[in-house]
């Protein structure tokens, strides 16, 4: 069933609807514009110079992956005009009337299209975002009927953007392969027939941003993700299991790169899978475009390189589909346990109220 409305149409409301209100422990701890410079910004200029800067760039990328699992890249070779076109057309789409966007509603198991909000199956609280999803690679899996036809140029621009990002992702995976002592193509080959999904996120202004998230805390399941974000701010990362958070400083024209669970496992845990979330604000909307590079469903997941003195972090090889199902099952179980704990807490509070009443009131 298609959603009745869009977030854009309710962003003017003064009070946040209950379905978006998160538990206190999940609410933002750092402001969307309280920027940190802890995430490295790495220039890729000279990355193709085997005898030149490639070694230096490789060291910086590896250090970032071992420390945070997230870094930013500039001088990456993706045409600035293409980036501008992609972001401009995306904003045009989200500015369309609700009925136009809902023509491409993705509910009901459709492959690609428009989504109003998102949430984990079995979880009641929803994220404050609107989404357009394109499945871009393998090319044979593209279903252009699920790609919005407005603005008119967006489909063609998305094709070019997808091609550019595929090349950039493979280049970065090549650097990480070499760092693991493997052939340049090792990580790309481990993906078998690499899948690419482009997710365009639009975070409208929010009436009470301190009560919700644009995208809840998570790690990406795939190999590597390249994120293009505007200058508003809202991407946050943690490396101490959520005790402290930083807001990633937006850099004009840069891509934020983060490793996913698959990349983490292939490196035998050497490279971190970035733990991150997105927060929103009441001052302005925010746009980001995430390009997820994932392995084929049948790809075998197992460490490609185990360093001396270490043991494999997986007991046995599994398929990517099995890995993904385990991740989803774990997330659902955590959501179920949290729900039970909340219900128990509520019952305990009610019982405490009864226990503290005067005897005359209890038997009245």
Curated annotation (Swiss-Prot):
Keywords, comma-separated and alphabetical: Dioxygenase, Flavonoid biosynthesis, Iron, Metal-binding, Oxidoreductase, Vitamin C
Residues covered by the Fe2OG dioxygenase domain: 191-295
Signal peptide: none
Pathway: Secondary metabolite biosynthesis; flavonoid biosynthesis
Reaction catalysis annotation: a (2S)-flavan-4-one + 2-oxoglutarate + O2 = a (2R,3R)-dihydroflavonol + succinate + CO2
Coiled coil: none
The protein's required cofactors: Fe(2+); L-ascorbate
Biased composition (Basic and acidic residues): 348-364
Binding site for 2-oxoglutarate: 286
Gene Ontology MF terms: flavanone 3-dioxygenase activity; L-ascorbic acid binding; metal ion binding
PANTHER family found in the cross-reference section: OXOGLUTARATE/IRON-DEPENDENT DIOXYGENASE (PTHR47991)
Family under the similarity heading: Belongs to the iron/ascorbate-dependent oxidoreductase family.
UniProt name for this protein: Naringenin,2-oxoglutarate 3-dioxygenase
Organism: Malus domestica (Apple)
């Amino acid at each position: 069933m298609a959603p009745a409305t869009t977030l854009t149409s309710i962003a003017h409301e003064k009070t946040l609807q209950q379905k978006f209100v998160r538990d206190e422990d999940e609410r933002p701890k750092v402001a969307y514009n309280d920027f940190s410079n802890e995430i490295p910004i790495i220039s890729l200029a000279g990355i193709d110079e085997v005898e030149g800067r490639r070694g230096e760039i490789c060291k910086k990328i590896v250090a970032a992956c071992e420390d945070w699992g997230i870094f930013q890249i500039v001088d990456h070779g993706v045409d600035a005009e293409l980036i501008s076109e992609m972001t401009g057309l995306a904003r045009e789409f989200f500015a369309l009337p609700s009925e136009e966007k809902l023509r491409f509603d993705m509910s009901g198991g459709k492959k690609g299209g428009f989504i109003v909000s998102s949430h984990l199956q079995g979880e009641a609280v929803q994220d404050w975002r609107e989404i357009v999803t394109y499945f871009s690679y393998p090319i044979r899996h593209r279903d252009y009927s699920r790609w919005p036809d407005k603005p008119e140029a967006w489909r063609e621009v998305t094709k070019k953007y997808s091609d550019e990002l595929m090349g950039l992702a493979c280049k970065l995976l090549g650097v990480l392969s070499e760092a693991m002592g493997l052939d340049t193509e090792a990580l790309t080959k481990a993906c078998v027939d690499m899948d690419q999904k482009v997710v365009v996120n639009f975070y409208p202004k929010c009436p009470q941003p301190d009560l919700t998230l644009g995208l809840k805390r998570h790690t990406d399941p795939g190999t590597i993700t390249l994120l293009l974000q505007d200058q508003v701010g809202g991407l946050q990362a943690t490396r101490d299991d959520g005790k402290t958070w930083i807001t990633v400083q937006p850099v004009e024209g840069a891509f934020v790169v983060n490793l996913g669970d698959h990349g983490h496992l292939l490196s035998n845990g050497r490279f971190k899978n970035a733990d991150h979330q997105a927060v929103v604000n009441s001052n302005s909307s925010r746009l980001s475009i995430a390009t997820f590079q994932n392995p084929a469903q049948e790809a075998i997941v197992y460490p490609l390189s185990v360093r001396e003195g270490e043991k494999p972090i997986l007991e046995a090889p599994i398929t990517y589909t099995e890995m993904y199902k385990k991740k989803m099952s774990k997330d659902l179980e955590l959501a179920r346990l949290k729900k039970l704990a909340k219900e128990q807490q509520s019952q305990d509070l009610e019982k405490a109220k009864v226990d503290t009443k005067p005897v005359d009131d209890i038997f009245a």
